[in-house]
Amino acid sequence: MTAVRKQDMWMISSVVDEHNHDVSPTKSRLIRGNRKLNMQVKRTLDLNDQAGVRINKSFRSLVCDAGGFENLQFVERDARNYIGKQRRALGKEGDGQALLNHFSAMRELNKDFFFEIDMDPDNRISNVFWADARSRAAFMEFGDVVSFDTTYLTNKYDMPFAPFVGVNHHGHSILLGCGLLSAEDSSTFVWLFRCWLRCMGNKSPEGIVTDQCKAMQNAIQMVFPNTRHRWCLWHIMKKLPEKLIGYTNYKEIKHTMKQLVYESSTAEDFESGWNNFIELYDLELNEWLHTLFEERHRWVPCYLKCDFWAGMSTTQRSEGMNAFFDGFINSTTTLQQFVVQYDNALRSKAEKEYEADFSSVNTTIPCGSQSFIERQFQEEYTHAKFGEVQNEFRCKMNCNVKNVVFDGIRTKYFVKEALIWKDESADKMREVIFDPSTKDIECSCRLFEFRGILCRHSLMVLAQEDVRCVSQKYILGRWSKQIRRWHTLIRASYNTKKDEPNVKRYDFLCKKFYDIAELACESQSGTDFLVDQLESLSKNASIRDAGATSLGAQKDMSSTPNTAVEHNNILSPVHVKRKGRPRGLRMQSTVEKIGKKKNM
């Protein structure tokens, strides 16, 4: 194309179109100069990223909102680039420093936020512990029994995630603080447990459930000497194939051992049965079984059922917390991103607790019988715990009193329960002791002592004795819906991200627009009126000029160097080498597993 300028005008003198391509208006949106992200798109991406929504899902939602790809002014790569830029801006001072700044901001918002960072001689982060104010308050009510585990390793530095998990009045898992560790040795666990102990006002839990890790056991004995410590039963039984598969009669050994572990009513029954079991299958030289027997008081149910464990016999509550992070966390996740997702977990758990509180107080689960005792628990317990009580009432139908012995003070009932499991059935005899003068009751199954729920055998005897109201000692305040709990008055988390002034104004205006739009959309006339008003406003010179001025000022502010105070320039941790756990065997998120399959 040739152009000639004549008298302040450009004249086209010739055009050669040999090198031109056909015009394609529909593809013009893909030209880089035509692609852009407006404020609404950026805000959506930011909020979704904070909530842990993956970018591909955020992009799909924007496509649906626009009515198709062809209606967007950007492509998925633009969205990824924007989020990547935002994340880099947040962590430009380094991951370690960013984590410290985040924790410091949390403490400024609530002085009861607790954190400690352990650093190596090079000023790099080694270990981290933190707990928000709500978790600290919740510990005072539900910190009697906790589960602790370190199986989840998905983050940029391969640092194990170590949550302290309790059980609230709805039976929900509740977070009571957590750590990220550089090692899984005794000294590291001692550091973490001491941090947690200081955080909780030097109050130790009454019981703690862990796996068989010797380093954990040593640390617990040192930091929590008066705390009951039990091993995860599920992990032990899961190892049976690995430890016993070499024996020719493995299936028979496995069946006998399971029956011995789960069916032994007393310690004497277990010990005599174990000796017979070892001798019968010639297992005297099996070191693993020998170690298990030496530590039987840590894992065999009949040794542990007399103490309160809130129903916990495994660490699966700790491992269950990992499911929340699945899909949001991967091997490139920074420490700060991990902590943000942890905050999301806190908010999610708190919301579920609020909903369960509301449901328990404002709705009623009908009784399944005419029992006065069932009605008593209906009035006192949360829905979840009352549901457990109702299950015992239903199972009471499988119980029958076979014999009664009175010694002049107390009455001993022999209650036979018909048990059905899959295609097998069996009878189990329980001894229930009832004191007519005090109405106290005690069952050999120890469900009340272990779980805090009156068992079916006791309910059978109470009905036999025509007891219509149980003592308050059998109605645990821990499961009550009538108690106002202090931790529920504390916010679960605080947003430390400081939005730019124009973003705050944008959010404020959007909320106003949504309210007006909801009113206007009720009729066509209202819609037409609002559209006319908006079009008139968009042409208003004062609004356009003010917006341009504000945008220029915003750009000037964005170029201003960060003047935040640095805290000794804390460095990011080094990549952790797993001791005794090969990296290839670490627990991975579903996202990583799918990614590996695609690359095979």
Language model features with spans:
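Short, charged amphipathic recognition helices of the HTH superfamily
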Residues: A51-L62
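Conserved beta-strand -> loop -> alpha-helix junction used to position metal-binding or nucleic-acid-contacting
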Residues: E76-A79, H172, L176-C178, G207-A215, ...
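Short, basic interhelical loop/turn and adjoining N-cap
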Residues: V63-R77
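Charge-rich, intrinsically disordered regulatory segments
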Residues: R5, M9-V16, Q50, G67, ...
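Basic, short loop/linker segments at the boundary and entry of helix-turn-helix/winged-helix-like folds
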Residues: D8-L47, A131
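Surface-exposed, charged/polar loop-rich segments
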Residues: M1, K92-L100, S104-M119, D132, ...
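Structured nucleic-acid-interacting core domains from mobile-element enzymes and related host factors
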Residues: K85-F161, V167-N168, W288-F293, L304, ...
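Active-site beta-loop-alpha junctions of metal-dependent nucleic acid enzymes
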Residues: R29-L37, K156-Y157, C178-G201
